[in-house]
A protein has these predicted regions:
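Amphipathic alpha-helix from the class-I
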Residues: 66-75
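C-terminal structured subdomain/cap of oxidoreductase catalytic cores
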Residues: 1-6, 56, 76, 80-87, ...
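Mid-domain catalytic core of redox enzymes
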Residues: 1-53
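Extended hydrophobic-aromatic, low-complexity segments
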Residues: 51, 71-72, 163
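A glycine-rich dinucleotide-binding beta-alpha-beta segment and adjacent secondary-structure elements
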Residues: 34-42, 94, 98-160
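Flavin-binding catalytic cores
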Residues: 3-5, 27-36, 52-54, 75-117
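Short, histidine-centered active-site or binding-site loop motifs used for metal coordination
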Residues: 65-67, 157-158
Length: 180
């Protein structure tokens, strides 16, 4: 949360780092946290002003990082978490939100360990399975289990996909599939 507003920032913003393909390979293939980053920034207060106090703004910044299943090279988030958060803030201030640090009133950081421990997500993956073409949309696990009779699935790791629209759609599909 902030005590100031950035009226020129839209609801969704993507800040691509200098080497997008290399960054994606570092994160998803090598399990390495790189020196550079790309960020997705969500500003819900632009479409729903009740998300922030009057005169303030609300932002969510997502920095893709390796999940915990990559082994020894995975960062120790207890050790580097705050410095990484500061690095994200510096990128935001430089590229999108000048003066953010002076107006920051609340901040919360989620790491892969948060997703693992709080949400029981395997390897701390924030959005379930990897964002590869053969794990997207139709290729995700379907809502009716093929292995266990009577098992129905909904959520970010199932068809149709991750993100709030995908999760809600998954629940709507499931509501039609489960017998009365």
């Amino acid at each position: 949360g902030t005590s100031g507003m950035w009226g020129d920032v839209g609801h969704h913003t993507v800040l691509n780092g200098p080497r997008y393909r290399g960054l994606v390979e570092d994160i998803f293939l090598k399990g390495r946290l790189s020196d550079d980053m790309s960020l997705y920034v969500h500003r819900p207060s632009v479409t729903d002003p009740t998300c922030a106090p009057e005169g303030g703004d609300t932002f969510y910044a997502l920095s893709p990082v390796p999940h915990l299943g990559h082994g020894a090279q995975v960062p120790d988030w207890a050790e580097i978490g705050e410095s990484y958060r500061q690095k994200v803030q510096a990128v935001l201030e430089e590229q999108l939100l000048p003066g953010l640090g002076e107006h920051l009133t609340a901040s919360e950081m989620f790491t892969p360990e948060t997703f693992r421990d709080r949400y029981l997500s395997p390897h701390g993956a924030g959005f379930s399975i990897e964002p590869r073409i053969l794990q997207s949309a139709w290729f995700r696990p379907h809502n009716v289990s093929e292995e266990a009779e009577g098992l129905y699935l909904a959520g970010a790791g199932t068809h149709p996909g991750a993100g709030l629209p995908g999760v809600i759609s998954s629940a709507e599909v499931l509501a039609q599939l489960v017998p009365d």
